[in-house]
Amino acid sequence: MSKLRKGDTVIVIAGKDKGKQGTVQAVKNDRIKVEGINIVTKHQKPNQATGVEGGILKQEAFLHISNVAILNAQTQKADRITYQFGEDGKKQRLYRSNGEVVATA
């Protein structure tokens, strides 16, 4: 289970895009797709049946979830997430450094 969710703002902590920030677009198992990060070039063949034009496309690719960390909105630094049950009995995600509740998108 991933502690990051779609809509979270993350910072890349390792790899060619280290230091860049973006919003999570998708989470699959232990991989994550971040807006504007890990751009790769894809060669698309044209397909008349589906109406897809061919060409060279640039798109985001998945990267391993260990290479990103959630961005703490108050400190603007990478942080980790912990869980705690609130007074209403629901599980909440908290920043580990200051204990503030993570804003969900």
From Swiss-Prot:
Q: Tell me, which GO biological process terms does this entry list? A: translation
- Cite the CDD domains for this sequence: KOW_RPL26
Cite the InterPro entries for this sequence: KOW, Rib_uL2_dom2, Ribosomal_uL24, Ribosomal_uL24_CS, Ribosomal_uL24_KOW, Translation_prot_SH3-like_sf
Which SUPFAM superfamilies did the record assign? Translation proteins SH3-like domain
- Gene Ontology terms, cellular component aspect? ribonucleoprotein complex; ribosome
The yes or no answer to whether the keyword Ribosomal protein is present is yes
Looking at the Swiss-Prot or TrEMBL record, what is one Pfam family this protein matches?
A: ribosomal_L24
Task: State the UniProt keywords alphabetically.
Answer: Ribonucleoprotein, Ribosomal protein, RNA-binding, rRNA-binding
Q: Which GO terms describe its molecular function?
A: rRNA binding; structural constituent of ribosome
Q: Which family does it belong to?
A: Belongs to the universal ribosomal protein uL24 family.
State its role.
Answer: One of two assembly initiator proteins, it binds directly to the 5'-end of the 23S rRNA, where it nucleates assembly of the 50S subunit.
Question: What NCBIfam families does the annotation carry?
Answer: rplX_bact
* Family annotation (PANTHER family): MITOCHONDRIAL RIBOSOMAL PROTEIN L24
Q: How does it assemble?
A: Part of the 50S ribosomal subunit.
Q: Any idea what this protein is called?
A: Large ribosomal subunit protein uL24
Q: Which organism is it from?
A: Psychrobacter cryohalolentis (strain ATCC BAA-1226 / DSM 17306 / VKM B-2378 / K5)
Name the gene for this chain. Answer: rplX
